[in-house]
């Protein structure tokens, strides 16, 4: 059985980040451990040497792939360093989820909180993807907003400066814990600018915030422009900025529940308007029921995120309370998975872009839009 881990190469003149493929003993190492080994070097853009130009690794700042040769040696001396705290937090949260939740619910919560989808049941993953809910399994700006909302609910709206001072460091810590993907980094920057602007007597300007976020990300790694998550994240938020305010104008004066439903619908439609062509291109499918699935489940996912995170933090501090704290979030997880399963069984719930007709249909829809 093999394993792979991201590593930093401690050698002058070589790019710092790489993916190391070795044996299963890598899984037992603590974040920050040193690995000394003979390894085969391959370019991340052309690992087979056949002239390929892959961008999925370089978009994440990875330029080298290492393949273990021989027996490595390990040194855990540096594993407790402060800079590896986010990785240790991620491991602790994952282990706590495993102890407190059943296999199915724990796999969902692990994907929701940490973006770790490898434990997710194949059928559940397929159902979520088919009905347009796969984005809740990829840690992104949505999850960052969930966390910021949770902190705001716990602290209240009175002490804005204190809430800003607490929220911004915590969302950036969460970003590091979950891997600092372009989509979540974008959200951290936009949320930070949105919270700081009123304190400085300025209006929050979403187009400026999203442009500044993109500039910072590309300055750090220009190859990140090829990241699918970056493209989907920025296209979704651009759609929300452009379309959602136009749609939510009709919600004024409506009943509270109707207003909430219209806001959810408008936000989902805004997120889809620019991201749908990209999703169809990369994944070859369009979920027809995605508006319905998001309307039914997104509010529930936000509740599961908040209660699930609180339950895991409590269980990490007091393991004896783990099962009790997990009861309510587990019910929410089962409900989300049940709704996804029911919607997936509907006929014509998705369109697959494997023919010229389906591509022409999508182009026609956008032409009349």
Q: Which residues fall in each region the model found?
A:
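Membrane-interface helix/helix-cap signal primarily in integral membrane proteins
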Residues: 1-135
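Hydrophobic alpha-helical transmembrane segments
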Residues: 81-83, 113-118, 178-184, 207-209, ...
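Generic structural signal for well-ordered, non-membrane alpha-helical segments
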Residues: 82-86, 90, 105, 185, ...
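N-terminal transmembrane-helix/juxtamembrane module of multi-pass inner/ER membrane proteins
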Residues: 87, 91-94, 344, 348-352
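Amphipathic, well-packed alpha-helical segments that form the structural scaffold of globular domains
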Residues: 94, 98, 113, 129, ...
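Proline-centered turn/helix-capping motifs that create local helix->coil transitions or kinks
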Residues: 101-104, 205, 225, 340
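Hydrophobic alpha-helical transmembrane segments in multi-pass membrane proteins
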Residues: 122-291, 353-369
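Alpha-helical transmembrane segments of multi-pass integral membrane proteins
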Residues: 240-348
């Amino acid at each position: 059985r093999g394993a792979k881990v991201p590593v930093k190469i401690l050698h002058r003149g070589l790019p710092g980040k790489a993916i190391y493929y070795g044996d299963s003993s890598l899984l037992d190492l603590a974040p920050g451990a040193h690995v000394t080994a003979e390894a085969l070097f391959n370019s991340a853009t052309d690992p087979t040497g056949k002239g390929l130009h892959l961008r999925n690794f370089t978009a994440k700042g990875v330029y080298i792939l290492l393949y273990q040769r021989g027996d490595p040696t390990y040194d855990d001396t540096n594993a407790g360093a402060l800079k590896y705290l986010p990785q240790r937090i991620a491991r602790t949260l994952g282990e706590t989820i495993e102890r407190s939740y059943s296999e199915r619910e724990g796999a969902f919560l692990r994907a929701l909180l940490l973006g770790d989808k490898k434990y997710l049941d194949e059928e559940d993953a397929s159902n979520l993807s088919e009905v347009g809910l796969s984005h809740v399994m990829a840690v992104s700006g949505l999850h960052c907003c969930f966390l910021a909302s949770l902190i705001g609910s716990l602290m209240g709206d009175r002490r804005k400066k204190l809430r800003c001072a607490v929220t911004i460091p915590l969302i950036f810590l969460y970003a590091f814990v979950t891997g600092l993907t372009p989509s979540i980094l974008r959200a951290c920057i936009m949320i930070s600018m949105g919270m700081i602007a009123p304190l400085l007597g300025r209006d929050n300007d979403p187009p400026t915030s999203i442009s500044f976020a993109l500039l910072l990300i590309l300055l750090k790694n220009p190859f990140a422009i090829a990241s699918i998550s970056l493209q989907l994240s920025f296209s979704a938020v651009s759609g929300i900025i452009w379309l959602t305010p136009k749609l939510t104008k009709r919600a004024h004066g409506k009943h509270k529940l109707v207003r909430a439903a219209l806001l959810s619908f408008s936000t989902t439609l805004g997120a889809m308007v620019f991201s749908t062509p990209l999703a169809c291109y990369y994944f070859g499918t369009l979920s027809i029921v995605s508006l319905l699935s998001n309307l039914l489940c997104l509010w529930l996912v936000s509740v599961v995120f908040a209660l699930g995170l609180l339950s895991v933090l409590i269980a990490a501090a007091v393991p004896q309370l783990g099962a009790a704290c997990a009861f309510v979030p587990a019910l929410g997880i089962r409900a989300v998975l049940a709704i996804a399963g029911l919607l997936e069984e509907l006929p014509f719930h998705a369109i697959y872009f494997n023919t010229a007709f389906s591509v022409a249909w999508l182009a026609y829809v956008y032409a009349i839009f």
